[in-house]
Amino acid sequence: MQGKIALVTGSTRGIGRAIAEELSSKGAFVIGTATSEKGAEAISAYLGDKGKGLVLNVTDKESIETLLEQIKNDFGDIDILVNNAGITRDNLLMRMKDEEWFDIMQTNLTSVYHLSKAMLRSMMKKRFGRIINIGSVVGSTGNPGQTNYCAAKAGVVGFSKSLAKEVAARGITVNVVAPGFIATDMTEVLTDEQKAGILSNVPAGRLGEAKDIAKAVAFLASDDAGYITGTTLHVNGGLYLS
């Protein structure tokens, strides 16, 4: 990955940060994005001279265009895109507000469309590109209270398979990494009883770690994975067996 330029959205903390750090450790120059200047500064601090943090609103097409122009001017064309930014707006469908549906779709699915599309011209010209979209186990299993989130993550899989077929002949791979239950800030607030309930369904007997996802992303971004495309790599300790 030496000399490659990677863009990782939503990399202030958790899985996104682990991905950014893993790619930079492999030699890539990583641009990580945050929704605020403070977040971008934090990314720049942990990446040091191996990358830079920048502000991006993934739901705003103009923000995306501005960011990509800045990256091109300052660093060059992007070789590796990791669409990691995502949110949750959980609710039972009967109670779900329209904005809870549309916010999820804009952030978790439409942003993948906009960013991936923006990469294609330069990647096709170079005949090289890696697009890695972060999905979720619930995109395959479903989850009550998350019809919006599950639909978006399932959509990411369908999008990735279709795009993979469109661009494979130009040396571009498009894959999904689908995490199971990963130990992050969000799982820290769970009670011991809630954690035990989750772990009872995980054959591996533990929550995953952010580095487990980062290692999977780094593999798919590498030259070793050049013949793998349109695939969903499930990283979930056996919670879901595809």
Swiss-Prot record:
**Catalytic residues?**
149 (proton acceptor)
| Annotated S-S bridges | none
Keyword line: Fatty acid biosynthesis, Fatty acid metabolism, Lipid biosynthesis, Lipid metabolism, NADP, Oxidoreductase
Q: Which SMART domains match?
A: PKS_KR
InterPro entries membership: 3oxo_ACP_reduc, NAD(P)-bd_dom_sf, Sc_DH/Rdtase_CS, SDR, SDR_fam
What function does this protein fulfil? Answer: Catalyzes the NADPH-dependent reduction of beta-ketoacyl-ACP substrates to beta-hydroxyacyl-ACP products, the first reductive step in the elongation cycle of fatty acid biosynthesis.
> Know the name of this protein?
3-oxoacyl-[acyl-carrier-protein] reductase FabG
Q: Which gene encodes it?
A: fabG
